Design a protein with these regions (language model features):
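Rossmann-fold cofactor-recognition segment
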Residues: 45-60
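C-terminal helical subdomain
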Residues: 174, 187-224
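Conserved NAD(P)H cofactor-binding loop of Rossmann-fold oxidoreductase domains
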Residues: 82-88
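Short alpha-helical oligomerization interface
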Residues: 90-102
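Residue(s) in the substrate-gating loop at a strand-loop-helix junction
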Residues: 132
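Active-site helix of classical SDR
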Residues: 112, 148
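Conserved glycine-rich cofactor-binding loop
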Residues: 10-11
């Protein structure tokens, strides 16, 4: 039986990923801040998974919780880092910005470090980080979120390079979704993907050990267009 941990499993992409992996027969470790939602999800899945509350803004406790989850689940093959927060910033607010940095940036680095340490000792494994197409866009209305996702994508690329250079049999998978129909996306957006379809593509890519996954597939062309388009032209639309 394959085993995976999902950090940020209480709603949206993480919740759907738990459902699809459970259906495939995975034994899961479900982690999130909202424990009541995790318990409800686990009940829906037959109460066969390990549930644990984690708050990525409490760094010491979060580190201990991840280590405990790994110890309880045993022989974990995949660790999926899905936790993230973000909304539009009509005014700059340091308290909000710090929350985004703590969860999206510091939390991901902390969880990745624990995961890498474990997989190095295990001599194999896969870290999956959920970034965003926002990593390639500097929006003035969501600048902290976009910057945090740019960090996520860059950090995972660096982690992948480190694993390859050290000849470690560890797969680093970066997932960059476009707009997915989840509670985090509160309004109708262009090319909105149903969460079931989006996660199905993610799971397929994860199981194929892909290093970079764009969701949905057309997002790859959007990213390519952004990279070749002059900045002055992009600014007309963002």
């Amino acid at each position: 039986m394959k085993k995976a941990i999902i950090v940020g499993a209480s709603s949206g992409i993480g919740e759907e990923m738990a459902k699809q992996l459970s259906e495939k027969g995975y034994q899961l470790g479900l982690m999130a801040r909202r424990i009541e939602l995790l318990n409800t999800l686990n009940d829906e899945l037959g109460s066969k998974h390990v549930v644990m509350q984690i708050d990525l803004q409490n760094f010491d406790d979060a580190e201990n919780k991840m280590k405990t989850m790994i110890s309880e689940l045993k022989d974990v093959e995949i660790i999926i880092l899905n936790s993230g927060i973000g909304t539009q910033e009509y005014q700059l607010n340091w308290k909000y910005q710090k929350q985004v940095i703590d969860v999206n940036v510091s939390g991901l680095v902390l969880m990745s470090t624990v995961a890498m340490d474990y997989f190095i000792k295990r001599e194999r494994g896969q870290i999956v980080g959920i970034s965003s197409i926002a990593a390639h866009i500097s929006s003035g209305l969501a600048l902290t979120y976009c910057a945090s996702k740019a960090f996520v994508s860059s950090y995972l690329n660096g982690l992948r390079s480190r694993a390859r250079r050290s000849k470690l049999p560890i797969t680093i998978t970066t997932i960059e979704p476009g707009y997915v129909d989840t509670p985090m996306v509160k309004s109708e957006m262009p090319w909105m993907a149903p969460v079931g379809k989006a996660v199905s593509q993610m799971v397929k890519g994860i199981e194929n050990l892909e290093q970079h996954i764009y969701i949905t597939k057309r997002v790859r062309w959007v990213v390519w267009f952004i990279k070749i388009t002059p900045n002055w032209l992009i600014r007309r639309f963002i």
